[in-house]
Amino acid sequence: MKFIVKLFPEIMMKSKPVRMRFTKMLETNIRNVLKKVDETAKVQRQWDKIMVMVPDDRPDLVEAFAERLACIPGIAHVLQVNVSTFTTVDDIYQQTLVAYKEQLAGKTFCVRVKRAGKHDFNSIEVERYVGGGLNQFTEAAGVRLKNPDMTVHLEIDNDNLYLIDKRIEGLGGFPMATQEDVLSLISGGFDSGVSSYQFIKRGSRTHYCFFNLGGDQHEIGVKQVAYHLWQKYGESHKVKFISVPFDPVVQEILERIDNGQMGVILKRMMMRAATRVAQKMGIQALVTGEAMGQVSSQTLTNLNVIDRCTEQLILRPLIAMDKQDIINISRQIGTEDFAKSIPEYCGVISQKPTVKAVLAKVEAEEAKFSEDLLDRVIADAEIIDIKEIATQMDTKITATETVDAISAGEIIIDVRAPEEEEKSPLELDGVEVKAIPFFKLATQFADLDKEKNYLLYCDRGVMSKLQALYLQEQGYNNVKVYRP
């Protein structure tokens, strides 16, 4: 079994040197991701595609490879194929007949062939020969060239025949790290998660800057979002997660700033702090999830005033998107459930926000801040490799709270997303297993029997640890992490 990785069309349009560079980087990215699934993963770059080989003795890797390839930027689509050699057109037909005879029963069909190399036949001749044979010697309902029930896809590359078993749509975009790095201001909500994803997809290593306004619980939730985005879409490269303690800034805003200017000034302070972080990291651009008119600070007038506080490029990929479209994308990329459980902190500090801020007035209000305020919060910022989020949870959750065995009376809570739990349900003899997705656990845990002990489970142990830490912050001492 092999996968044929087809490049995103915009890559194919590049000049030869750029195209080669992008293809090499995509090959490396694929190898980096798949080696985390299996160390023996083999990836081979060709001019217009990349081949991924699955060992014949490891059919269990097919689905895992397919899932990972579908989430790597730079891929248009992936073809899951069975590979063989052929000698004649009739040989191609005979192999196709064996592969598709049962599937064609009672269905209309057509045959589509792509060919590369030197042959004494063309693609249309193969389509006619194979299609005619299948129509005559199978129980198919007949040939239909437009809107058939089934299309038999074949690819011929010199003397190799690829019988296409499945087509998997890719993420599109450019390979990771073909574009410059960006620093995404992430709050954990719908918008910042989607805007971060847009730049990952476009080929930028996306680092995360979080302004903590809500304490440890807020930070835990946002780290889950950032870790999910990195693990699913950007795992081929290292990125940083920066947490800036912004409660001193909020406190001074509440004490010293005119109520109507609070929202705009808070955003300006965030941009100033993010600019300093970006400059330290050698990053040229900031990314935000702002959409025009969505809230009071996001009118064109206010966005203009916000941008005046920094010379750093501020990118807003969602600027003209509707909220529902943003939510739909968040659902597709798996951040919707996180966002639902994280409150919006920025909006609570101003009761009557202005929609037409005046720069001079804003600057006059900002003069009331302590001179060293930003210096202090930047000095206290925590910068970690995003992979360390899992390690951090290990250090905060003691050894007695992480177990690999289940005691009598303990209950397992499977915190995986519903689709993951349904795909491979956790079944243990003599043990009660409750399926409560991570995004519902915070609200449903209080309804559980307080006399019982609960063990949280997920595939990699990251989400279960984050949820355990969150519940412990809430005062629950009857929760542990289950790592079999």
Swiss-Prot record:
Disulfide bond listed as a keyword: yes
GO biological process entries: thiamine biosynthetic process; thiamine diphosphate biosynthetic process; thiazole biosynthetic process; tRNA 4-thiouridine biosynthesis
Keyword Chaperone applies: no
Residues annotated as the enzyme's active site: C458 (cysteine persulfide intermediate)
Localization, UniProt: Cytoplasm
GO CC field: cytosol
Gene Ontology terms for molecular function: ATP binding; CCA tRNA nucleotidyltransferase activity; tRNA binding; tRNA-uracil-4 sulfurtransferase activity
Top-level EC class: transferase
Entry-linked InterPro entries: Rhodanese-like_dom, Rhodanese-like_dom_sf, Rossmann-like_a/b/a_fold, ThiI_AANH, ThiI_fer, ThiI_N, THII_Thiazole_biosynth_dom, THUMP_dom
Biochemical pathway: Cofactor biosynthesis; thiamine diphosphate biosynthesis
Binding site for ATP: L185, I186, K267, G289, Q298
Domain THUMP: 63-167
Catalysed reactions listed for this entry: [ThiI sulfur-carrier protein]-S-sulfanyl-L-cysteine + a uridine in tRNA + 2 reduced [2Fe-2S]-[ferredoxin] + ATP + H(+) = [ThiI sulfur-carrier protein]-L-cysteine + a 4-thiouridine in tRNA + 2 oxidized [2Fe-2S]-[ferredoxin] + AMP + diphosphate; [ThiS sulfur-carrier protein]-C-terminal Gly-Gly-AMP + S-sulfanyl-L-cysteinyl-[cysteine desulfurase] + AH2 = [ThiS sulfur-carrier protein]-C-terminal-Gly-aminoethanethioate + L-cysteinyl-[cysteine desulfurase] + A + AMP + 2 H(+)
Protein name: tRNA sulfurtransferase
Organism this protein belongs to: Shewanella pealeana (strain ATCC 700345 / ANG-SQ1)
Organism ancestry: Bacteria, Pseudomonadati, Pseudomonadota, Gammaproteobacteria, Alteromonadales
Protein's gene: thiI
